[in-house]
Amino acid sequence: GPGAAFGWRGSSRIPARRRDARHGVLAVSGLVLPDPATAYRVGVVVPPSNPVVEPELDVLLGDEILQYGARLPRFTGLSLEERNQRYLPAYAEALDQLYGLDVTCALVAMTGPNYQLGLDGDRALCAELTERFGAPVSTASLAIYRTLNSLGINRIQLLSPYPDWLTGETVRYWEGAGMTVVAVEHLLGEGQAFSAYETCTEEVVAHLQSVEPEADCAVLVTGTGLVSVASIYQMDYGCSRPILSSNLCGAWWILQQCDRSPGSRLYREIAPGHVPCEDPGPDCGPGCHEL
């Protein structure tokens, strides 16, 4: 029947629908379905080969928020450094692909290209894109900064999937933003090529476990193509040792734009220990960062 795709097999009629108490959600035969007419809509600009952003945001944002993606162009035959130069002016064209969707906000899920700009340049870029797009726009790098600023943290330990030259740009960005980078853990070995998209959760967890967390310091897993949600979930530093990632901070920023939507159940489990918390849970310790 017409409802087979939603698991309504064996029924000759479409079940009665009822609106869930949550924003933009319909409950149909026990299934929770987002209602595109009333759900929050958000745009996400993604690198062409990045397989991580949409799945991680999807499990963090919850049923009240629908994400609509626009992929950046594929630049073949160029080095990572050359691609990073070309991505920056391509953000605006990618956002144009979302025209007519009336999105609440848009996240440019990129960090690497933005680090060459420094914080002030990143802010200026997002302000320009916001004005052009007509809705709030943030890069993932600026979302990380806003998260750190809201947490009141100015010391970070960096987990970098980048080659040395881009790790250097990353460190300069954060130091220019007023952060003290106390340590850098490299995912790449000597002479190894950029491979964040092929890095599995177990590898990220192993590197995180090798980091000796310091007091009043956040561990930053940078790069939207690096698997982070499952990695953070498996770690147990406690609330006083937040682990931040590009996608977790991007999700936090999106939720703030969507009237501080609570996010998914998984997000609500992770958030109290790592990002500013709207409603801390009973298991959150003394280091919890309440808004």
Regions found by a protein language model. Give the residues of each.
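N-terminal glycine-rich anion-binding loop in soluble enzyme alpha/beta folds
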Residues: 26-93, 164-200
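Periplasmic-binding protein-like
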Residues: 104-109, 157-159, 216-223
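Conserved beta-alpha
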Residues: 125, 129-190, 271
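C-terminal functional extensions of proteins
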Residues: 245-284, 288
